[in-house]
Regions:
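A short, basic N-terminal segment
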Residues: 1-39, 44, 59-65, 353, ...
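C-terminal leucine-rich, beta-strand-based interaction scaffolds used for sensing/assembly
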Residues: 2-8, 293-377
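P-loop NTPase nucleotide-binding core
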Residues: 42-47, 51-156, 337
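Alpha-helical DNA-recognition elements
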Residues: 59, 176, 267, 345
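Conserved Walker B catalytic segment
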Residues: 127-195, 204
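Helix-loop-helix "sensor" segment of P-loop NTPases
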Residues: 201-252, 274-275
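Conserved C-terminal helix/linker of AAA+ ATPases
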Residues: 247-248, 270-291
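C-terminal helical "lid" of AAA+/P-loop NTPase domains
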Residues: 247-253, 259-273, 308-311, 344
Length: 377
């Protein structure tokens, strides 16, 4: 694993030594997969869901080198065909030892879908893509899963932002996937998602195909004390120290959200100054100001009612009863019906979400910017 100049990783997964805690969740997911259980992983964005998946897969690869682990993020897919093409590119050819015989076998197996082989520029590993016409969608998906089944290899597949399949225009996508997945004797899945209400409905509603098909894990925040020990250990490599109260100030400033903590720690480590609450405030303000152009564009894209509601939620930080007369009157908001309509739009656009019973601004830095610039608007 590469040695990093800054141990506080903001993007991607860089290995176990740079990964904080999650021992309990890692063990739970690994045991589920190893005991033939699919698992659902639910958390808001920026809590560390994707990093945890890669951490689990790294641990599995060390313990079970013959097991194949695949990760695909389907957030950008808009229909079943795009899902199938991404799945094909992710898995086809990756469970075979590279040889001319294996490549011919794959080409023959997927002959009806015009398979094309290319080589990854970074790794040199062959990658296959297939062409799927609308009439071939169901058959092509069946072929991919049959290919995995016939490999007789143990396979774990993580599908991130899995709730996206509910947005596809094709009818019956969930039922189609479920019908194939349940009969795979050697393939087990992590279904991960950031939209809690959609994921919960998909897996806990008796009317949905994936009902009671998987173990559920709602990802909690990283424990403050564990995070403190991790942060202080790495700060010590640069002769920096941070007392527990100072770290707790940072942790609570961003509600324990992993990505924001990492972003601030990364900058504190870079600066190399004495770590105080004042330094944390300075670094946080710097990070917020760096994104001001984006925040102005977000705000300007809203209607007056949406902007007023977003600002009101930012001022209160967390709102339990958003349609209450007290909240509406304190912030001079329009009628409850207008607030309800604005709320729906803000949720759909992922400006806000409901967490532990309260509505919160999704982007913590955007919330800070709103409190600073839009108070009373």
């Amino acid at each position: 694993m590469e040695q990093l100049n800054n141990p506080f990783v903001i993007y991607g997964y860089k290995g176990t030594e740079y990964f904080c805690d999650r021992k309990k969740e890692t063990d739970l997911i690994m045991k589920a997969l190893q005991n033939e259980r699919n698992i659902v992983l639910i958390s808001p964005r920026r809590i560390g869901k994707t990093g945890l998946i890669h951490h689990v897969f790294e641990n599995i690869s060390k313990q079970e080198p013959e097991t194949h682990c695949f990760y695909l993020d389907i957030n950008a897919t808009r229909n079943l065909s795009q899902f199938i093409q991404l799945l094909a590119k992710t898995v086809i050819g990756k469970v075979d030892t590279f040889s001319q015989t294996a490549m011919r076998k794959i080409t023959t197996f997927f002959a009806g879908y015009k398979p094309t082989m290319s080589f990854d520029e970074m790794t040199g590993i062959p990658t296959f893509s297939i062409t799927v016409s609308p009439s071939q969608r169901e058959d092509s998906l069946k072929h991919i899963f049959e290919y995995l089944k016939q490999s007789e290899k143990r396979i774990y597949i993580a599908i991130d932002e899995f709730q996206q399949i509910a947005e596809y225009p094709e009818d019956g996508t969930e039922a189609l996937l479920r019908s194939y997945i349940q009969f795979l004797p050697n393939v087990y899945f992590i279904f991960a998602g950031s939209k809690q209400h959609m994921m919960t409905d998909m897996f806990l509603s008796a009317k949905r195909p994936f009902y009671q098909s998987s173990q559920i894990l709602n990802l909690p925040l990283i424990n403050l004390d564990e995070y403190y020990r991790f942060a202080n250990r790495w700060m010590g490599t640069r002769n920096l120290t941070m007392d527990h109260d100072t770290f707790a100030y940072l942790y609570n400033k961003v509600d324990g959200q992993t990505w924001y903590i990492q972003d601030i720690l990364n900058r504190l480590y870079q600066n190399g100054k004495e770590i105080t609450t004042a330094e944390i405030d300075d670094v946080t303000l710097e990070l917020v100001n760096e994104q001001e152009v984006a925040f102005v564009n977000y705000y300007d894209s809203l209607t007056d009612n949406q902007a007023a509601l977003l600002s009101a939620i930012a001022q209160d930080k967390a709102v339990t009863s958003i349609l209450s007369q007290d909240f509406i009157s304190r912030h001079n908001l329009p009628a409850a019906s207008s607030v309800s309509l604005a709320l729906k739009t803000l949720i759909n656009r992922e400006f806000i979400y409901k967490y532990n019973g309260s509505y919160i601004i999704y982007d913590r830095f955007f919330g800070m910017w709103l409190r600073k610039n839009c108070a009373g608007n």
